[in-house]
Amino acid sequence: MNKVKIGEKYEVDITSMGHEGEGVGRIDGIAVFVKGALKGERVIVEIEEVHKNYLKGYTVKILEKSQHRVNPLCQYADRCGGCSLQHLSYKGQLEYKTQKVKDNLERIGKIYTKVHYAIGMENPLNYRNKGQFVVGEIGREKITGFYSFHSHEIVPVDNCLIQHPLSNKVVSVVKEWLNECDISVYDRKKGKGLIRHVVAKVAFKTGEVMAIIVINGEDIPCKEELIEALKEKVPGLKSVILNINTRRTKMILGNKNIVIYGKNTIEDFIKDLRFEISPLSFFQVNPIQTEILYDKAIEYAGLTGKEVVIDVYSGIGTISLFAAKKASFVYGIESVKEAVEDAEKNAQVNGVKNVKFIWGKAEREIAKLYKEGVKAEVVIVDPPRDGCDKEVIRAIVGINPKRIVYVSCNPSTLARDLRYLEDAGYRTVEVQPVDMFPYTYHVESVALVERM
């Protein structure tokens, strides 16, 4: 029986690191996950949570320090939930993420294959092209920032080091406007108040900026004052949008957008392809590493110009359009109608003719294409964090492609899905992690899977 109690302190050797970047050790044989500790350290831990098979705690004192421990660059690092690895050197982060992918593949999928060292960034700061800031209030002062780790407590952040400087500027202007006009902010417990979030999107290649004000209503007071302040202080401002979200939900954006200044999209490039980005568009948040990620995906696809490719979860068509350059024909399948419409526009803007985007459930559309005589040699999948639905994987296996390229943002669901593919007669040739999210525990990977 677990005799450890909340509030007790223990000396613990940290032998590994967990899924969210926490240190992992043992107390009387029970695993303890320690916030703020690193592999190789000996620390004093105070227990915060006691569960049947594991414990959670935080670092009170470091007795023996890791060679990879550094002082955080960010002043909010110990409170903000955005970055969990500010205290780990960048080399240490890349080693952790490489090992994380390897461990997940072996532990969950029983897959033993070549996992390459994670590809990192030369400058792992200011890399995000999208910032989503929550709005709150301390006393009478309106604040903007991020939630604390696993909490709905808002940490006020004036300058986020992983955001593009123009995103920080947008939020600074909006916060000033909120206070000057004394506009109500949303209270998630009561479901009342007007301003919920500020979302800033920045196109790295073109410098265009979109400011999105998420509101619990249909309009805002002092609208002209906001527009004028943003125009004056934000270089490259092309769009100011009200996003209507009146539901009591954790979702940041609602489905309705009202343009109050400029246009409804901004434009950016990935390599030489141009993309229109709308308020609801999914676009990889790290444009520098996205080029590396997509280059690796296309390399793994092994295209010679003769192949038919099916791109599953194709979004706004980014990977499909890159594949179309080297393939005979590409079919992109996506369940979100607006994303398909954006993808079609992007194909048109870039003059890409050998691609077709299909709106529908992937498992159904894959089977339909097969019945119509489409023989795909290569399938590319880029699913959300939950991984591929079982029906989708069955449908992919059912059309018997020679190669599958799996782009993953979650090593655990990647491991699960690769196990299914291996049981169905495929083998995982190699996996390349790419660090899309420096200073966080997230890691993207590309896996090459071939028919045996």
Curated annotation (Swiss-Prot):
Its EC number is 2.1.1.-. [4Fe-4S] cluster binds at residues 74, 80, 83, 160. GO terms for biological process: rRNA base methylation. The active site is at residue 409. Keywords: 4Fe-4S, Iron, Iron-sulfur, Metal-binding, Methyltransferase, S-adenosyl-L-methionine, Transferase. S-adenosyl-L-methionine binds at residues 284, 313, 334, 382. It comes from the Bacteria. The keyword Secreted does not apply. InterPro entries: MeTrfase_TrmA_AS, MeTrfase_TrmA_CS, NA-bd_OB-fold, SAM-dependent_MTases_sf, TRAM_dom, U5_MeTrfase_fam. GO terms for molecular function: 4 iron, 4 sulfur cluster binding; metal ion binding; rRNA (uridine-C5-)-methyltransferase activity. The keyword 4Fe-4S applies. Residues 3-61 form the TRAM domain. Belongs to the class I-like SAM-binding methyltransferase superfamily. RNA M5U methyltransferase family. PANTHER family: RNA M5U METHYLTRANSFERASE, TRNA (URACIL(54)-C(5))-METHYLTRANSFERASE. This is Uncharacterized RNA methyltransferase TTE1812. The lineage of its organism: Bacteria, Bacillati, Bacillota, Clostridia, Thermoanaerobacterales.
